[in-house]
Structure formats: C-alpha cells, structure tokens
Amino acid sequence: MKQILDFIPLIIFFALYKMYDIYVATGALIAATAIQIVVTYALYKKVEKMQLITFLMVAIFGGMTIFLHDDNFIKWKVTIVYAVFAIGLTVSHVMGKSAIKGMLGKEITLPESVWANINWAWVGFFTFCAGLNIYVAYQLPLDVWVNFKVFGLLAATLVFTVLTGGYIYKHLPKEQNGQSSDVPTDE
C-alpha cells in the first residue's frame, strides 16, 4: 500500500502534463505530494525523511516553476533531490552511520562491509541519475524529459532496488536467507 501511495503524485503529474501542460502538472504534483504526506502520516503515524525532503524540493522548485513560469526549476528539482540523497548517504557514512543500514538494519543482519558497499552503490546510483537528468532535461525536448522522469528514473530505481536485494540476499546469514545452517552450500 505504501509503495502505491508513493507513486500517486508521479502518476498525477504525468497525466496532467499530457492533458494540459508542465505548469498545471507541477501544481498538481505539489498538491498531490502534500496530500500524500498527510495520508502517509494518517495511515502509518510516521513520515520518512526522504518523503519530507522530496516534498520540500517539490514545493520549492515547483513553486518557482509556477511563479516564474519557467520549467527549468522543476527539471532541476530531480537532480537536486538525487544529489541531496547522494550527499546524505555520503555524510552518514563518513560520520560512521549508514543511513541505509538505519532503514533496513533492524530486519536484516549484514556485515558492516556489505552495508558500506550498498551505501556507496546507492551514492553512485543517485549521482548518475542526477547527472543523467541534467543531460536529458537540457539536451532533449520537454516531452522526452517528462517520460524519462516518470518512466525512466522509476524503472532504473526499481531495477537498482532489485539488484540491491540480490546483493543483500547473497550476503545474508544462512538463517535469514532461508537456508539451514546444517545444509551444505556451494560456497
């Protein structure tokens, strides 16, 4: 349910962009993201930091897009959000606390080196996506950028999440990955 709730603002943005324009879509994105935060809190009594950061960026850059009637701001929002996530993961690692471990470490037991590898992989992913967004936003037409933002980045994130899950599974203790500790493995 929560994952579906996370995609609703993006779907609304895409639909209204196709029906109207970037400015109507951006206004709807701001409103839908605000409603998403309220609904998330009502259902789960908690809102994650990533959601709050995303909302703040949507409100600031979306507001500037509408107020100044300049779609460059909403294009930059994507890059800045990914950059903030990459910087946040880097800073948390340097300070000795893996943000990803903080999110998943209660359910999953992994060696510190594996958490560090996952952290750096996501830093690389977010950095790559931030740069790719700038390229697509300024080298290709607005329609292409909207499709890239909605479908390309979503697909890339889902694929990277699955790859991360595979990496995690590979490094789980035998008890957590469904294998009995007395069953021989091919290691």
Swiss-Prot record:
Stated role: Plays a role in cell envelope biogenesis, maintenance of cell envelope integrity and membrane homeostasis.
Protein name listed in UniProt: Inner membrane-spanning protein YciB
Presence of the UniProt keyword Cell membrane in the record: yes
One Pfam family of this chain: IspA
Superkingdom, taxonomy of origin: Bacteria
UniProt family annotation: Belongs to the YciB family.
UniProt entry tagged with the keyword rRNA processing: no
GO cellular component terms, A-Z: plasma membrane
Membrane topology: Multi-pass membrane protein
Keywords annotated in UniProt: Cell inner membrane, Cell membrane, Membrane, Transmembrane, Transmembrane helix
Transmembrane segments: 25-45, 50-70, 76-96, 118-138, 148-168
Compartments where found: Cell inner membrane
